C-alpha cells in the first residue's frame, strides 16, 4: 500500500512518484489549495492538493485530523523561502495526484494543540502513541533492545528464556499470584526476576546467559516504577565482580554512543559508605556539585543540644551542606526547605548565611550564631569552602536521618537553583554495600537479595558477625538513577544455608522454598555473578523523560490499573468456581 514512509522523504526523492499511508496531523484549506501535514511512525511530510487534480482536491476538503489516508503523488523541492528547517522533511513536499480515505475519525478525545491529562492519555493510549514524541520514544526503545541483543551475541551470550509461572520466593516485594486449576488451592507466582533460574543455568554449564524479560512486583508505585517491567538480565560464570562490571560498563557505553553519540568514558567507582557520607544517597547524582561535609568534631562542646547531642553520639551525625549563592534565599524559602526535610525525619534546618566571610562571626547571619564562637564559625567556613553569598544548611540527628534529609535537600536545591548540570552525563559504580540491614523488628533483612555472596568472609565468620558483612554487590548509577544492580552469587551450600539462617529462615522453610537450589549447590556449582538493568529506566534516561510511563507502550497507572482496558477486572464466577476460589467481600463500616 505504501512505497515510502512520510518522515523518510528527502531531496534525493525529488521527481519520484511515491505512495504514502498515515494520518492527517493538520489541515490548512486555502480555497484553491489544501495543505496537510501527513504523519506516520517515521515523521511528518507536507502534502498539497491543487486545482489541476480536482477529484483529489475535492476529497481533501473532507479531511480532518486523524483521518487514516493513502496519498499518491510526486515529491517536489520547496522554494527556498518555504523551506522549514524545523522539519526533517522541510526541504520537500508532495504534490498529491490521488487520495484515498481509508478510515475517518470521530471527534477526538485528545487535543493535539493542548496538554492533555495523563488520565486521558492513558485511557486513549492508541491515540497518544500517534504523537511524534511518543513514537520516537518507542522507536528508541526498540533500537536499545536491538543494540543489546547484538552486543550480547557478539560477546558470546546465549538468549535463554526462563519460566513465567514459577514459585513464590522472598525477594523483597509481594508476588503476583496465579491460581492453578489443576492443583486446587495451589498458586504459581509471576517472577520478580529470573534470579534463581539464571543461577541454575550457570550450574547447568551455560556460562554466559542473558534475557530481555518481563518481571512483576506487587508494590507501591512511583513515577519510575511499574507493576510489570522489563529487565536486561545477565549472568556469567567464572568471572570476578570487576570483570562483570567491565563487560556491563562496555554495554552501557555502547548504548550511549549509538543512541546519543556520547562517550561516557570510564565509570568512577565509589563505596556505599562514601556515597552516603558525601551525598546522602547510595545513588548519587554527580551532576550536582554540592556535598555533605562532616562537622561533628567542631561542635561537640557547643551549648546547643541540637548540635552537641548528635556530635557526641556514636550513632549520631552533624553534617553541613554548602549551597553556592544560597544566601539569596528568602526567609519563606528557608522555612519551606525546613518543612521539606521534616518529610525525611529531620526536626528542622539550622543554617548560616555567609555575607562577608572575611568578617568571621560578624559576617554571617544565623539563628544559631549565638551558640557558636568565632573560631568554630571560621572552622566551619573553612571546611565547607564557603564563599561570600553562600548558604550552609545543617543536619543533626542519627546518621540515617541526616543522610536522608540532607541528601534529598541536596537534590531539591540542585534543581531549584539550577546547580545541577542538566546537559551532563554522570555515571558511576557503587560497591561494597552492607550485606544486611535492620528490619525494624530486631532482625536482619538482605539489602539486595539472599543469594548475594559476602566479600572475604567464611560461613562461620558471617554467622558470628553478620552486621559487619559487606556484600560483593554493585549498582550502576547514572544521573542519580539506579539503572542496574548485581552481585557475586553464593555458590556454596553451607554459605547459602548460613545466610538463610541469619534471615530467620529455618531449615524446614529452606527445604520447602529453596530445596531445589540447595540440592543444585551440591553438584559442582561454578562461581558466578550477574546483573540486571531496568530497560524502562535506561530508555527513560536515553529519551530525556522523567516519567517511566512515557517509554512503555501500554503502562499502568500509579494505582496499578490500565485505564484503557479497565484491568484489573472482576473474574467470571464460573471461572472462580473452577479454580476453587471464593471472593470474600470486605465488611463495610457502619
From Swiss-Prot:
It catalyses: tRNA(Asp) + L-aspartate + ATP = L-aspartyl-tRNA(Asp) + AMP + diphosphate. It comes from the Bacteria. L-aspartate binds at residues 171, 217, 448, 489. GO terms for molecular function: aspartate-tRNA ligase activity; ATP binding; nucleic acid binding. PROSITE patterns: AA_TRNA_LIGASE_II. It is found in: Cytoplasm. Its EC number is 6.1.1.12. The keyword Aminoacyl-tRNA synthetase applies. Transmembrane segments: none annotated. The keyword Aminoacyl-tRNA synthetase applies. GO terms for biological process: aspartyl-tRNA aminoacylation. ATP binds at residues 217-219, 226, 482, 534-537. GO terms for cellular component: cytoplasm. It holds the Pfam family GAD. Keywords: Aminoacyl-tRNA synthetase, ATP-binding, Cytoplasm, Ligase, Nucleotide-binding, Protein biosynthesis. Residues 195-198 are annotated as: Aspartate. Homodimer. Belongs to the class-II aminoacyl-tRNA synthetase family. Type 1 subfamily. This is Aspartate--tRNA ligase. It comes from Salmonella choleraesuis (strain SC-B67). The gene is aspS.
Amino acid at each position: 500500500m505504501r512505497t515510502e514512509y512520510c518522515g523518510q522523504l528527502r531531496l534525493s526523492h525529488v521527481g519520484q512518484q511515491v505512495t504514502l499511508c498515515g494520518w492527517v496531523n493538520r489541515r490548512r484549506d486555502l480555497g484553491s489549495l489544501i495543505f496537510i501535514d501527513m504523519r506516520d511512525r517515521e515523521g511528518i511530510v507536507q502534502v498539497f492538493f491543487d486545482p489541476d487534480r480536482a477529484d483529489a482536491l475535492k476529497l481533501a476538503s473532507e479531511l480532518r485530523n486523524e483521518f487514516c489516508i493513502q496519498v499518491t503523488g510526486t515529491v517536489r523541492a520547496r522554494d527556498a523561502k518555504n523551506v522549514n528547517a524545523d522539519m526533517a522533511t522541510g526541504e520537500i513536499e508532495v504534490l498529491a495526484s490521488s487520495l484515498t480515505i481509508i478510515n475517518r475519525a470521530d471527534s477526538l478525545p485528545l487535543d493535539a494543540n493542548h496538554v492533555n491529562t495523563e488520565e486521558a492519555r492513558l485511557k486513549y493510549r492508541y491515540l497518544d502513541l500517534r504523537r511524534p514524541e511518543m513514537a520516537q520514544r518507542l522507536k528508541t526503545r526498540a533500537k536499545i533492545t536491538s543494540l543489546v541483543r547484538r552486543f550480547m551475541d557478539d560477546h558470546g551470550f546465549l538468549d535463554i528464556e526462563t519460566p513465567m509461572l514459577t514459585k513464590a520466593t522472598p525477594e523483597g516485594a509481594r508476588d503476583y499470584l496465579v491460581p492453578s486449576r489443576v492443583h486446587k488451592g495451589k498458586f504459581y507466582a509471576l517472577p520478580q526476576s529470573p534470579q534463581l533460574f539464571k543461577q541454575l543455568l550457570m550450574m547447568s554449564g551455560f556460562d554466559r546467559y542473558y534475557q530481555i524479560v518481563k518481571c512483576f512486583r506487587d508494590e507501591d508505585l512511583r513515577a519510575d516504577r511499574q507493576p510489570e517491567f522489563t529487565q536486561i538480565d545477565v549472568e556469567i560464570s567464572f568471572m570476578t565482580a570487576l570483570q562483570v562490571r567491565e563487560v556491563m560498563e562496555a554495554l552501557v557505553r555502547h548504548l550511549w554512543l549509538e543512541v546519543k553519540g556520547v562517550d561516557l568514558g570510564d565509570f568512577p567507582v565509589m563505596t556505599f559508605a562514601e556515597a552516603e557520607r558525601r551525598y546522602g544517597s547510595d545513588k548519587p547524582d554527580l551532576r550536582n556539585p554540592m556535598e555533605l561535609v562532616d562537622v561533628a568534631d567542631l561542635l561537640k562542646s557547643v551549648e546547643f543540644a541540637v548540635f552537641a547531642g548528635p556530635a557526641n553520639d556514636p550513632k549520631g551525625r552533624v553534617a553541613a551542606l554548602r549551597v553556592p549563592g544560597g544566601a539569596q534565599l528568602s526567609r519563606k524559602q528557608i522555612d519551606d526547605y525546613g518543612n521539606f526535610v521534616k518529610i525525611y525525619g529531620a526536626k528542622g534546618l539550622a543554617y548560616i548565611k555567609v555575607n562577608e566571610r572575611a568578617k568571621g562571626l560578624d559576617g554571617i547571619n544565623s539563628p544559631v550564631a549565638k551558640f557558636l564562637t568565632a573560631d568554630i564559625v571560621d572552622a566551619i567556613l573553612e571546611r565547607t569552602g564557603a564563599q561570600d553569598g553562600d548558604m550552609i544548611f545543617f543536619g543533626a540527628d542519627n546518621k540515617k536521618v541526616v543522610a536522608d534529609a540532607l541528601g534529598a535537600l541536596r537534590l531539591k536545591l540542585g534543581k531549584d537553583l539550577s546547580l545541577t548540570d542538566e546537559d551532563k552525563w554522570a555515571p558511576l559504580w557503587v560497591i561494597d554495600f552492607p550485606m544486611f540491614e535492620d528490619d525494624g523488628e530486631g532482625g536482619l533483612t538482605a539489602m539486595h537479595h539472599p543469594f548475594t555472596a559476602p566479600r572475604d568472609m567464611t560461613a562461620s565468620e558471617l554467622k558470628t558477625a553478620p552486621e559487619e558483612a559487606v556484600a560483593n554487590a554493585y549498582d550502576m548509577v547514572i544521573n542519580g538513577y539506579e539503572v542496574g544492580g548485581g552481585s557475586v552469587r553464593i555458590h556454596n551450600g553451607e554459605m547459602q544455608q548460613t545466610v538463610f539462617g541469619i534471615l530467620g529462615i529455618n531449615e524446614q522453610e529452606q527445604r520447602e522454598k529453596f530445596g531445589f537450589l540447595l540440592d543444585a549447590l551440591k553438584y559442582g556449582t561454578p562461581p558466578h555473578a550477574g546483573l540486571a538493568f531496568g530497560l524502562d529506566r535506561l530508555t527513560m534516561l536515553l529519551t530525556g523523560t522523567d516519567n517511566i510511563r512515557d517509554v512503555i507502550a501500554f503502562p499502568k497507572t500509579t494505582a496499578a490499573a490500565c485505564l484503557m482496558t479497565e484491568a484489573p477486572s472482576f473474574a467470571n464466577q464460573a471461572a472462580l468456581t473452577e479454580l476453587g476460589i471464593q471472593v470474600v467481600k470486605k465488611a463495610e463500616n457502619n
